[in-house]
Amino acid sequence: STLMRSSAASDVYKRQVYRLIESGNEVVVFDNLETGHIEAVHPKTKFYKGDLRNRSEIDSVFDKEKGIDAVIHFAANSLVGESMTNPLKYYDNNLNGTKVLLQSMVAHGIDKIVFSSTAATYGEPERTPILETDPTNPTNCYGETKKSMERMFYWVEKAHGLRYVSLRYFNACGAHISGKIGEAHNPETHLIPIILQAAQGTRDHISIFGTDYPTSDGTCIRDYIHVTDLAQAHILAVEYLMKGGKSDIFNLGNGVGFSVREVIEKAKEVTQKDIKVVEESRRGGDPAVLIASSDKAKTVLGWKPEYDDLGTIIKTAWKWHSTHPNGYSK
């Protein structure tokens, strides 16, 4: 199959490109490299640098790359805090970018898309673990735009026959077991990389944002899922659509929650380093608990996560950070 990916140079998604190529697929990459790294792009991909909001740029790729079977859509701004202070940026990039992509797909007869969604669509859940049928009431603008993108796919299917799979994944983390591919954001915003930067000394401390949540230790609880398992889920979703599967939404998580304090303690155990912790006030838009039920993905897609142990996940990330203290920078 020939697949196009929006934003394949960004950190947590490049493992999926490697897996697609290892499985014999041709992959076309479209990315503006705003937050990604050209060094992370697989050498066997066809890479185009461009802005998804520019219709002529995405049209040009579809014109040149005939025979694209499906699109895997990752391109989006994804920082919860920033989305609360700069919501218009998120509506412009996430919603407008997706609209332009869909317009071009419809014009070029490409009718299958796998979408990178998020647990943030649920907001403060009524229960855990969260089911795909549970209410979606986002508590931040990032989650709101992702929910709106899902609705866009729904209506475009009604009008134009587009089939889609939306993968609502929980906290992506970890690194490739080789230690060659890992997370490198600028600025860094993900919990585990920040903790490990504090452990290796490239960061002074780790901040805990909120210690008064209604949880066992007062800190937020999240479901952590390894990027390799996320990568496999996207491949299975493409195969599902290629075989005629109907549009659907799937949660991707391990079904177990860990508090911020628990993650820090596990990182201390893995790294054998002391990690300075600073307690701060809550950030806007952070739900107290997010834990997934992924039974549907396991049943329908045949998804089987390999990494269900937090210590193992952190070990893979620590291997990356230990050998790449400056990320992809030389």
Q: Model segments located where?
A:
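Conserved glycine-rich Rossmann-like NAD(P)H-binding loop of the short-chain dehydrogenase/reductase
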Residues: 25-34
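Aromatic pocket-lining residues of Rossmann-like dinucleotide-binding sites
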Residues: 20
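Single conserved hydrophobic/aromatic residue that forms the stacking wall/gate
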Residues: 1-9, 13
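Conserved mid-core alpha-helix of short-chain dehydrogenase/reductase
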Residues: 57, 100-104, 229-232
